[in-house]
């Protein structure tokens, strides 16, 4: 990547970050050069800035987590439109904690739990909870392995859904910097989603709402596989692609 490939708005953000680091509006060139070098090497701007805005909160991000995408942020709207006052919420594959923390902010009276297979991600999510002064129960778990009781009103999941063979086609900055464990969905991209659905065959909830973010190429076939669920529907993302599955059990 050459400097001519970096948009001016990104250069401006790097300058602001350099000023923040140095505490100076003028003597920041050395820091700016270092940050620019990192960006030229392909490091995502969000990791360099160390945070991203997510809906109405701020989330710290680094290589312990996947950078939240607009599709995941829009998932909050999907949830809001489908449930009003869940008492108990579970976020599966929480990563930075962004969805779980927004759930707690939107539904402050709810008990919110969030799990991830990565201990590093859980540590970061706890840091983000402290930064945003929000109380969420974060703990390490391979999907639902360490979840004691499945008595949730709402389960949200944004699990890895990229087929292993497609990983080399991703942008270089994604492959080189973001955690592959948060991207690799196995041979067909459905490994973890199918495991989660299998885990949910028996729940302790009388009225469970499940909201999944999925690959657009999987959406239709996945919806058709929800044979023991009711009110199964697809919801579209910001560019009108089938991106979310909403189902009740």
Language model features with spans:
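Residue-level signal for inorganic ion chemistry
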Residues: 14, 42, 72, 99, ...
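Short loop/edge segments at beta-strand edges and connector loops
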Residues: 49, 140-141, 214, 236
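Conserved SAM/SAH cofactor-binding pocket of Class I
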Residues: 74-169
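Conserved Class I SAM-dependent methyltransferase catalytic core
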Residues: 187-248
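Non-catalytic nucleic-acid substrate-recognition regions in nucleic-acid-modifying enzymes
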Residues: 1-11
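Conserved AdoMet
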Residues: 13-78
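Mobile active-site "lid"/loop adjacent to the S-adenosyl-L-methionine
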Residues: 161-191
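A general structural signal for well-ordered alpha-helical segments in protein cores
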Residues: 11, 32, 42-45, 96, ...
């Amino acid at each position: 990547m050459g400097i001519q490939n970096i948009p001016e708005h990104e250069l401006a953000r790097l300058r602001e970050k350099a000023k923040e680091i140095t505490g100076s509006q003028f003597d920041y060139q050395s820091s700016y050069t270092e940050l620019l070098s990192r960006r030229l090497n392909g490091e995502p701007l969000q990791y360099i800035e160390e945070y991203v805005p997510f809906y109405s909160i701020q989330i710290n991000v680094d290589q312990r987590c996947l950078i939240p995408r607009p599709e995941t942020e829009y998932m909050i709207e999907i949830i809001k439109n489908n449930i009003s006052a869940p008492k108990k919420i579970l976020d599966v594959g929480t990563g930075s904690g962004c969805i779980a923390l927004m759930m707690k902010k939107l539904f402050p009276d709810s008990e919110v739990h969030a799990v991830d297979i990565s201990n590093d991600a859980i540590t970061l999510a706890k840091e983000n909870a402290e930064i945003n002064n929000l109380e969420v129960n974060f703990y390490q778990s391979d999907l639902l392995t360490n979840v004691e009781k499945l008595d949730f009103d709402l389960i949200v999941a944004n699990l890895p859904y990229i087929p292993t063979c497609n990983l080399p086609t991703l942008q270089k900055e994604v492959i080189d910097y973001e955690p592959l464990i948060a991207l690799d969905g196995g041979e067909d991209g459905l490994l973890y989603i199918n495991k989660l659905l299998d885990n949910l065959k028996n729940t302790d909830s009388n009225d469970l709402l499940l909201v999944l973010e999925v690959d657009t190429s999987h959406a239709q076939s996945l919806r058709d596989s929800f044979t023991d669920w009711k009110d199964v529907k697809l919801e579209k993302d910001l560019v009108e692609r089938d991106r979310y599955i909403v189902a009740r059990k």
